[in-house]
Every structure is written in structure tokens, then in C-alpha cells.
Amino acid sequence: MSQILRKSKRKVNRSKRAKKGSHGIKVYKNTYVYIGKETSGGWSRDGIPAPKQEVVDRIIMRINTDKEIRKIMKHIKGITIKYAKTINRAGSWNGEKQWFEFVDHANIDVDDADEIIYHEIIGHAYWQWAKKWRNVEWTKFNEIANNMPPVNDYVAKYVDNKRDGRTDTDYENEQHSAIAELVMAGHSYHTKKGKVASDEQVDEMIKVWKEMHY
């Protein structure tokens, strides 16, 4: 009986720890990870290069070591890193599938990889996770972000998405990701040419953002 109990205990402990797979990313059991490989044939015959190794290494390092990402790893069900000849966007978070996708491209470097991770994972993925696990702080951030001008011109595209009395729209979500860029990188790669939030308003959003990211 004692041997059975010890065996059972070891099994439970292992299942609660994230482990590195052959891909090098520290994930929990049943998290799907795909890193694209080179396919032969050249562009004219649908051949595709593998993602640049330095970009892959940077993504792996961020996911494995960043404390903001480690908090929500159980929330991430899939990670895809691939290369494409042309792209509409280099990164995305699919909230329905809880899936992060990174698309490498000739013009993308390791700094771009950082910014995309900050925007998509520490921004969008964390915002979705916090709705359940940091709901008081999540609601407070959204109420303030909803009443503020957009952080940058990219967020301004979502102004029409704002709704009075609602704090769970794409506008607040994008405000959160924009603040994530500022907090993590010290700057945003999006412009501020239009009617955007003042420095004081951004500082107020940063304050409540940090309250949600304890």
C-alpha cells in the first residue's frame, strides 16, 4: 500500500510542473507546440525557409523566463512559430483557441519578436486570463482605459468598438496591450500622431495595469 501511495504522489507532482519538450519551450502537458521547418523546392515550388534561429531562440527565452508569461502558461493551449514570404501580421493571439502564433519574415528581427510577444501574450493573453483570475483589477483597468483616449494610433482604430457600460471590448483589450508594450519595452512601436492619450493619462493606465499584473 505504501508503495502505491508513493507512486501516486510522484505522478501528481510531475503533472503540475511545466517541462521543456524537444522544442525547448517550457510548457504544461497537452500544450501543442509547433516550430516550422524548412521545406524544399524554393519559393516558386512552395518551398519555405524555417523561422530564423535567432528569432526562435528569443521567443523561447521570453516564454521560458518572463514572469508575466509564466503566470499564465496553463492558459496557453498552443504555440506556433513559422515563416512566411508575405504576412499581414507577425503575431496573433486566438482567444477562442487560447493559441499564440508568431509568423517570421525576412524583415523581422529579435527586437520585433520581443514587441510581438509583449503585445500578444503579456497583452492580449494576459488580459483574457485576468478576466477570471484578476477580475477586480481587470475591471478597474478596463473602466479607466474605456474612458481614456487611445494610447496610440493603432488603438485608435478600435475607438468605435467602445460601448458605454461595457468594459470587455476590443478597445480595452488593445489599450491593455499598448500599455504592456510601454511597460515591458519602455516604448511602443506604434505611432502617436493622432488624438491620443496624454503622458499623464498613460501614466494613470500604467498604474492600474501594474495592479493587475501582481
Predicted regions mapped to residue ranges:
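Arg/Lys-rich, intrinsically disordered low-complexity tails that mediate electrostatic binding
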Residues: 1-24
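Active-site-flanking segments in enzyme catalytic domains
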Residues: 28-59, 70-214
